[in-house]
Amino acid sequence: MPSLWDRFSSSSSSSSLSRTPTPNQPPRSAWGSAAREEGLGRCGSLESSDCESLDSSNSGFGPEEDSAYLDGVSLPDFELLSDPEDEHLCASLMQLLQESLAQARLGSRRPARLLMPGQLVSQVGKELLRLAYSEPCGLRGALLDVCVEQGKSCHSVGQLALDPSLVPTFQLTLVLRLDSRLWPKIQGLFSSANSPFVPGFSQSLTLSTGFRVIKKKLYSSEQLLIEEC
């Protein structure tokens, strides 16, 4: 099965996507480098701060007020930090993430289709791009672990390597959440290991719009960065 990076590379064969520095080639595009230099001073402060909660159930605003608030956020300026190369790769990553969640196995009896609301897809993508911005290889250097949290339990869904040919420079752990109101519907998924396996999907479950991302640099001894959204 071709890797995510192979699929991404074949769809963008008209441009060189390598970020490995060479004497005659900068590590990123001139446009991306200029944007990075312009926003780097502000990016440093992001490594120690939590992002604002995007879950309207945890905020004092409704969906319209939340949208208006997000439109006014200027730190970081997402347009300044954007990189077309990473944005294209992120879109492919989000598609692969949704496919993995659709085949997730949360218990021993049946797998469940976990569905990401559109708002969650958008916000997770933006957060991954922001956390990858200060990395030497951008999003290509990410190793993404995906977990689903329900109550005090955290269930691993899988690990996604964006470019298997590249040594990862940082690790991201994405912790998604099931809506607590769904708990009566999913208790059967967490049966004991002795219960017989029943093939097929039990049901489709929609994830909460709240999530958490934990970033760990693999080339540095810096403390973990935890982003709560």
UniProtKB/Swiss-Prot annotation:
Record GO biological process: apoptotic process; brain development; cellular response to dexamethasone stimulus; defense response to virus; intracellular signal transduction; intrinsic apoptotic signaling pathway in response to DNA damage by p53 class mediator; negative regulation of glycolytic process; negative regulation of TOR signaling
A GO CC annotation given for this chain: cytosol
Location(s), subcellular: Mitochondrion; Cytoplasm, Cytosol
Region span, Disordered: 1-66
Gene3D superfamilies found in the cross-reference section: RTP801-like
Post-translational changes noted in the entry: Phosphorylated by GSK3B; this promotes proteasomal degradation. Polyubiquitinated by a DCX (DDB1-CUL4A-RBX1) E3 ubiquitin-protein ligase complex with BTRC as substrate-recognition component, leading to its proteasomal degradation.
Modified residue annotations for Phosphoserine: S16
GO molecular function, one term: 14-3-3 protein binding
Modified positions (Phosphothreonine) in chain numbering: T20, T22
Annotated Low complexity bias: 9-18
Keywords from the named record: Antiviral defense, Apoptosis, Cytoplasm, Mitochondrion, Phosphoprotein, Ubl conjugation
Subunit: Monomer. Interacts with BTRC. Identified in a complex with CUL4A, DDB1 and BTRC. Interacts with TXNIP; this inhibits the proteasomal degradation of DDIT4.
Protein family (similarity comment): Belongs to the DDIT4 family.
Function: Regulates cell growth, proliferation and survival via inhibition of the activity of the mammalian target of rapamycin complex 1 (mTORC1). Inhibition of mTORC1 is mediated by a pathway that involves DDIT4/REDD1, AKT1, the TSC1-TSC2 complex and the GTPase RHEB. Plays an important role in responses to cellular energy levels and cellular stress, including responses to hypoxia and DNA damage. Regulates p53/TP53-mediated apoptosis in response to DNA damage via its effect on mTORC1 activity.
Name of the protein described by the UniProt record: DNA damage-inducible transcript 4 protein
Gene name as annotated: DDIT4
